[in-house]
Amino acid sequence: MTMDADAMETETTDQVSASPLHFARSYQVEALEKAIKQNTIVFLETGSGKTLIAIMLLRSYAYLFRKPSPCFCVFLVPQVVLVTQQAEALKMHTDLKVGMYWGDMGVDFWDSSTWKQEVDKYEVLVMTPAILLDALRHSFLSLSMIKVLIVDECHHAGGKHPYACIMREFYHKELNSGTSNVPRIFGMTASLVKTKGENLDSYWKKIHELETLMNSKVYTCENESVLAGFVPFSTPSFKYYQHIKIPSPKRASLVEKLERLTIKHRLSLGTLDLNSSTVDSVEKRLLRISSTLTYCLDDLGILLAQKAAQSLSASQNDSFLWGELNMFSVALVKKFCSDASQEFLAEIPQGLNWSVANINGNAEAGLLTLKTVCLIETLLGYSSLENIRCIIFVDRVITAIVLESLLAEILPNCNNWKTKYVAGNNSGLQNQTRKKQNEIVEDFRRGLVNIIVATSILEEGLDVQSCNLVIRFDPASNICSFIQSRGRARMQNSDYLMMVESGDLLTQSRLMKYLSGGKRMREESLDHSLVPCPPLPDDSDEPLFRVESTGATVTLSSSVSLIYHYCSRLPSDEYFKPAPRFDVNKDQGSCTLYLPKSCPVKEVKAEANNKVLKQAVCLKACIQLHKVGALSDHLVPDMVVAETVSQKLEKIQYNTEQPCYFPPELVSQFSAQPETTYHFYLIRMKPNSPRNFHLNDVLLGTRVVLEDDIGNTSFRLEDHRGTIAVTLSYVGAFHLTQEEVLFCRRFQITLFRVLLDHSVENLMEALNGLHLRDGVALDYLLVPSTHSHETSLIDWEVIRSVNLTSHEVLEKHENCSTNGASRILHTKDGLFCTCVVQNALVYTPHNGYVYCTKGVLNNLNGNSLLTKRNSGDQTYIEYYEERHGIQLNFVDEPLLNGRHIFTLHSYLHMAKKKKEKEHDREFVELPPELCHVILSPISVDMIYSYTFIPSVMQRIESLLIAYNLKKSIPKVNIPTIKVLEAITTKKCEDQFHLESLETLGDSFLKYAVCQQLFQHCHTHHEGLLSTKKDGMISNVMLCQFGCQQKLQGFIRDECFEPKGWMVPGQSSAAYSLVNDTLPESRNIYVASRRNLKRKSVADVVESLIGAYLSEGGELAALMFMNWVGIKVDFTTTKIQRDSPIQAEKLVNVGYMESLLNYSFEDKSLLVEALTHGSYMMPEIPRCYQRLEFLGDSVLDYLITKHLYDKYPCLSPGLLTDMRSASVNNECYALVAVKANLHKHILYASHHLHKHISRTVSEFEQSSLQSTFGWESDISFPKVLGDVIESLAGAIFVDSGYNKEVVFASIKPLLGCMITPETVKLHPVRELTELCQKWQFELSKAKDFDSFTVEVKAKEMSFAHTAKASDKKMAKKLAYKEVLNLLKNSLDY
């Protein structure tokens, strides 16, 4: 040990005391005590309980890292499969908080704040070593915060393994600096040496190197007998087999057929549209698979070679087996495997006379090798073992796959053993998920699986106590593999069988050394136990770069991987994958690094020793990339940082329960003044067609004067009869006494409650609660008008008709009966004059109905025959007695002509109203004595008019809400109705909604933000610009902005339902109004709460931008955006361009300027706009991606604004469809081909060249002329459309950010713009919406090279499978064909 380490250990161990578990074995306690005193490597047999020692060590040190301590412990394991196993062991034996980490969790993209959350939450972090190494290099974690570092299977520590890098780069550097703040190291292994066949005398050297690197001393038991009492040792033995090749002619024939197949499929590559790199990749795969099949043929036999080919041809996982190949390449490789399978199958007998179980016969025929037969016979020799648990170790994944298949066929005929395979997923031949592997291992533990055929993945860490047989089908590659695979046999009296070819003395000798290797390692460790660990040679002379602010480092050895990682995060497409390019000059000892054009650093040169030239130039590039901000202070690519920020934004919490505001203009506090001033507005309703009833005028009285564009507005209502024009006009202020206000409220409550409820059940409760001493209440009046300005506009006679007594009526109408015009009638309320009840609102308790009366039927009384159809000769007396059990008492009194009360609807909806359900007859005859009089006099026309008032008030309330929002936004004034349109969603089913304004606002927002980012972030590549743009204008952020200004309460997002309408004047107990304060300290009221989606708030922000843009121009839109929190300005700045280039030598400047009708001031912009990322010539500093980013948003906005202005009366949603059909890459690509722009693009991609050539050829043969819509069946390269956008961006920048210049230049290229008559929906959307509308069943399926769509409609099925060069086009073609079939067959 070094002195510094000793000092650290003395200081720590004074406080740490051993915390052994009561069931710990003696050697485990001894190892624990040793580990507390000094850094220790525990070298013990597999199954001896090393993990338990580590757990006890953590228990002893736990006081140092229990939360809230900022410190923690790290438990490193070499394989992902061990993370869960070791974490579960920790949870079982400690109360520590344990976190688990592996690569698939996305930890590569975590930042320091995410790691801080983890270490604040957990006390022990179990992970693979590469994760810790990256976190330390990027300074997300600090070694000084780790109190204990446990290294499982520490024999891996060597070379460039992450274990070794952690120790060299961090632990020893800290130790050599004199600090004592380093973690306690605890290593575990069953083999200190990881060698293949070195002399046993070299073991101490290897052990000493490991001790030095780990700064730890080995602990082991002095004698194997100490362990023998606790750990069962398997009995090793050799199993010999004869290696006899399959019959020579048969083998030669099969090998020749494989070679011919390989040549055939390699030649067929020329018929595919593939670039050179893809061709190389496919050829390598073909050769690799051919080699694999030849290996299976020789080592396993024809039968298993056929199974291997069949397995490879049937694989459905393209990400591992086929890598980055496109669908045609995959199909070709799979066809090769399928053809090879058929060739092997031709050599395998078929029919009842042949059986796979006849292993000896199959061996003679060459179907199985003797090695395979030996394995089967060995397993069958254990048939008497009831609960066998066997692991068969093989070298290759394909061997594991085919042996499992063979054993699954043969063994069930002899016993009930079940076989599975477990193999790693990085071989490129087969993929098996971690979950699937864990399930198989768990089934093995439980006895549901008896045999596992495994690669080395199960050598380390698998803990199955009942495993009683291990077979090495392929010999162990080194002593470590030997010891660990032997240790899998955990059961007493278990066997460890090593299959060896007879006569292979070299392999047998090597395995014999492995058998004695464990003993030799133990002896060497004990003999040198007192030899201190020397300091690790200081390699601090290795160049490195360290960021002072964070401590993040990149070394010479890690710089290359960081550069490749950075380049992998740059924008790419199917024709170009950004990667560094090295120009090495060994004679001069120099290297030039060329980085992709989207990188802010284009070229780096360095001189160094030839051995480290690439590392030296990469280290220098890392320093420069950090300087310009392309690498963060944690040395993470800027794209990763931006994506991490974006991911965090997406996780912002949002509560879907949001308020629904009510306008304060219709709410007031109780006033004790004797008179109250109301401002009255005349509501006049004029139908566009004749109706059965006249619409009377109604007065709206408010406590405040309404804004002019509300108080003098007009709009329309709709019902099944037509439309009704509604106008509001101010008629003046009136002073009402408290008594008059109460009369008005009583009237409107009575009438509206009856209309809403169609009964009087809730009426008395509502009237009993009526008084003028409420706090906050709905305070506006809706009263009938007299149509006369001479006396009073308010019809007080009707208003005062509520709850009149019989005595009052008789006094007022005592002269009616004397002049013969009227008579007295008996009612439920007493005696009334006919002139009172002939125009009244009445209630009949016997059936619970409410009627409005229209006249007296003097020719009918109780003795009259019913006028009802099919009533026969029944009288009214008989009818009421029979039907209702009522005896009429005043049978001579005339009957009333009554009509069922009107049903309230919403008359704001766009949808055509269904004719309301009417009773058997519009009017019925009512005996007066059965009627309660509710209101009188009141005409049917007046009652009919009031059925429209809730809808009228809903519109006025909405306008007032929009006005309140408008008042919150300073400096800019736009029509209130436009604000209302912007806050009304489609769910309201109103005559208008926000979609058109949202489309317009979305395009302007995108344009404004993209322009600002382009100017202010001139070193950012397109991917970074796009990520930042999305972070600024994503739905999450727009919702956040909106909620900060409390926009969510203003949004109209629910269809108006009259039954939910709040009746003005009713007691505040009937509803709840809660005061809320807007950001500018103005009051508003919350009437209710409702569920509101995040996207709805975001849509309203965009639609309000569109509203302010359409009414006030770009400045108004920017002011609104600034108010809501989106800080954007249009101040243009001159961007410093790179040194000028000779544009004429690179592109045809004259032709391009003539085509565009624009002369470039900076012609390098034109070159940049035409340069694809694959064109890596150093004289061109940039590719078109940044200009494309800008031009995309400029064109989108220009076209959307053009369509919005040209067609101002578009129905909501049509603008969105027109924009989608006009602004898309397919349209732009078609424009590029028609203008021959493809001839002027600079690129260096064979794949792109072939794609463009094919596209142009298909276009020339087609009759396609339009430049919009989705008609094209041609799969255009995206590059063609991108160039149109990049040219627009180049003109925009060169012209000083002048949009009109861009539109004047690009519009002629676009040709005829789309119109409402020519717009066509995308077939995917059109078919989807059609199926949703008619409730058809839509299903889809995709394969490597095809897309299938099926629709089941009206017991018919319509399906089509389309193939294309890309999945997107195949999908479109399939949808398009099924859509046409559906339309033609069902006439849609």
From Swiss-Prot:
Residues 962-1113, 1149-1296 form the RNase III domain. It is an enzyme of class 3 (hydrolase). Its cofactor is Mg(2+); Mn(2+). GO terms for cellular component: cytoplasmic ribonucleoprotein granule; nucleus. A motif (DECH box) lies at residues 152-155. Mg(2+) binds at E1188, D1282, E1285. CDD domains: DEXHc_dicer (cd18034), PAZ_CAF_like (cd02844), RIBOc (cd00593), SF2_C_dicer (cd18802). It is found in: Nucleus; Cytoplasm. Residues 31-210 form the Helicase ATP-binding domain. ATP binds at L44, E45, T46, G47, S48, G49, K50, T51. Residues 1315-1384 form the DRBM domain. Residues 559-645 form the Dicer dsRNA-binding fold domain. The record marks K1278 as: Important for activity. Ribonuclease (RNase) III involved in RNA-mediated post-transcriptional gene silencing (PTGS). Involved in the processing of natural small interfering RNAs (nat-siRNAs, derived from cis-natural antisense transcripts) by cleaving small dsRNAs into 24 nucleotide nat-siRNAs. Plays an essential role in transitive silencing of transgenes by processing secondary siRNAs. This pathway, which requires DCL4 and RDR6, amplifies silencing by using the target RNA as substrate to generate secondary siRNAs, providing an efficient mechanism for long-distance silencing. Belongs to the helicase family. Dicer subfamily. This is Endoribonuclease Dicer homolog 2.
